[in-house]
Regions:
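Polyanion-binding surfaces on beta-sheet-dominated domains and ring/shell assemblies
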Residues: 1-115
Length: 115
């Protein structure tokens, strides 16, 4: 799910310029169950933050709650005030599930909104 400000022209131009400078994040972790490599949240932030900042785009991540789930969101906010947001619901039943789900959601929403 995605939400945006009414206007996106300045953000779109800045985001396109930032994306042109971004490289793929380093696959610095291994999933022990599937033996696959992935980029953790820190690697993704290290990859996208310099280019976004250079082009006047801030990253804000947080959570909202609904019954039985947490909504993780990542919002890119341009210096003009224009913004785009990606939201990801995380069902949970235990605090450990919630904590890992929030990290998972932050990683995936940041990747999605910057791609």
């Amino acid at each position: 799910m995605s939400n945006t400000s009414p206007e996106l022209d300045q953000l779109a131009k800045a985001l396109a310029a930032a994306q042109a400078e971004m490289k793929n994040a380093t696959l610095n972790k291994v999933n022990p169950h599937f033996k696959s490599k992935y980029a953790d949240l820190a690697a993704i932030r290290d990859t996208v933050t310099p280019a976004l900042t250079k082009h006047g785009i801030a990253v804000v991540q947080g959570t909202d709650t609904t019954e039985g789930s947490i909504i993780v969101f990542t919002r890119l906010i341009h210096a003009s005030g224009q913004w785009i947001e990606s939201r990801f619901p995380i069902p949970y039943d235990k605090p450990q599930t919630m904590g890992s789900g929030i990290t998972y959601g932050r990683r995936y929403t940041l990747s999605a909104v910057c791609n």
